């Protein structure tokens, strides 16, 4: 199974873009060359602010959705403190209890 990664890219105007991929370096180069997400085209210099392995594609999609719901301040904290992401990932891996 190929591991998936969650990454955040910082634009020249200090915005954070969130995405998932199986190859962070390849995807970052695509964004840099203008062949990635339209949201990043024409945004000036891009820097990879954060990346972390998340497991399978399903978990990566859930993590991406959760991070996109965070405020800018919360995303900045995630970038600065790895423990914040570990907590978020742990909360996504906890199985939900279903009642009958």
UniProtKB/Swiss-Prot annotation:
Which part of the chain is the GIY-YIG domain?
2-77
Taxonomic superkingdom? Bacteria
The record's section on CDD domains has: GIY-YIG_UPF0213
Q: Which residues form a coiled coil?
A: none
Output the SUPFAM superfamilies linked to this UniProt entry.
GIY-YIG endonuclease
Similarity remark: Belongs to the UPF0213 family.
* Cross-referenced HAMAP family: UPF0213
Task: State the name under which the record lists this protein.
Answer: UPF0213 protein YhbQ
List the top taxonomic levels of the source: Bacteria, Pseudomonadati, Pseudomonadota, Gammaproteobacteria, Enterobacterales
């Amino acid at each position: 199974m190929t591991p998936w990664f969650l990454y955040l890219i910082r634009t020249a105007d200090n915005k954070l873009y969130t995405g998932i991929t199986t190859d962070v370096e390849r995807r970052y180069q695509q964004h840099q060359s203008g062949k990635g997400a339209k949201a990043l085209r024409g945004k000036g210099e891009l820097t990879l602010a954060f990346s972390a392995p998340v497991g399978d594609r399903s978990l990566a999609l859930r993590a991406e959705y959760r991070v996109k719901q965070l405020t800018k301040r919360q995303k900045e904290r995630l970038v600065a403190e790895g423990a914040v992401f570990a907590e978020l990932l742990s909360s996504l891996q906890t199985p939900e209890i279903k009642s009958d």
